[in-house]
């Protein structure tokens, strides 16, 4: 059993008492750090960085050297699974992801292999093992995956999209084909996340970045149903610890009750949700993570501290809150801002845990 020097993040996810509110940042290993840019340049390109365990470890640890963060998150990408399925992933300079072979018919779905996490995705597991070794038990390591719906949007659209016309066309005209794809992706995600847990991650998160573009019934049917399947299939205890599961649907504030009923341990919230209202709705069932607008980090230190204090007050007394941004940190925020943010969370949250 690994004894963590700081297990505040895991305790908060399980709604157990903590001394202060834990904090980490989505995309905390990333382009806002000059040392990240240098390491990525050394790797050559983004996927080469992901595939090199030592360099992926280095960028995972970089933000922890600068800021007093309560968790590390594996440096990887949500599109590793479709890439391992053979869709030909590439990232152009200054562009989003593109797939050379998008999915557009039933036989394409049927022919998709489910990747073996210790074969096609072994580079991810090697990174997990390397990071765990180098963390030396300082803080927990978070593993993650994209949700089936979100992965499917990229696979069907062939890359990023604003209108999601191709996948919505499939959803309304060929729903059986889309369900077949989503079911296969859910199976792949379960294998992938369980392999990450066996390799050493101590909590997992499912990112449903594009669930918020769906209508109410469609969200339940095409996104949440498959996240529920994933939650049911995950290893929930490892190395003497519970392995908490967080679900995050960007734009998912309407569906918190349904999300909380999946059996997950926590919900990620974006900044459109009032934390006090979210706590009243589902705080008796799950912990909450979030939810400061990442753009607040463009503001003055005093304004950042004010926003942190407001969000802490919204959640109020007790455990069950992991402070985070409502989405990933922007790459051009002032260098001082993340430190002001992280330190403010710790400083001002002690009052709420006495």
From Swiss-Prot:
Keywords: Cytoplasm, Decarboxylase, Lyase, Porphyrin biosynthesis. InterPro entries: UROD/MetE-like_sf, Uroporphyrinogen_deCO2ase_HemE, Uroporphyrinogen_deCOase. It catalyses: uroporphyrinogen III + 4 H(+) = coproporphyrinogen III + 4 CO2. One of its GO terms (biological process) is protoporphyrinogen IX biosynthetic process from glutamate. GO terms for cellular component: cytosol. It is found in: Cytoplasm. The record marks 77 as: Transition state stabilizer. Pathway: Porphyrin-containing compound metabolism; protoporphyrin-IX biosynthesis; coproporphyrinogen-III from 5-aminolevulinate: step 4/4. Pfam families: URO-D (PF01208). Homodimer. Catalyzes the decarboxylation of four acetate groups of uroporphyrinogen-III to yield coproporphyrinogen-III. Belongs to the uroporphyrinogen decarboxylase family. This is Uroporphyrinogen decarboxylase.
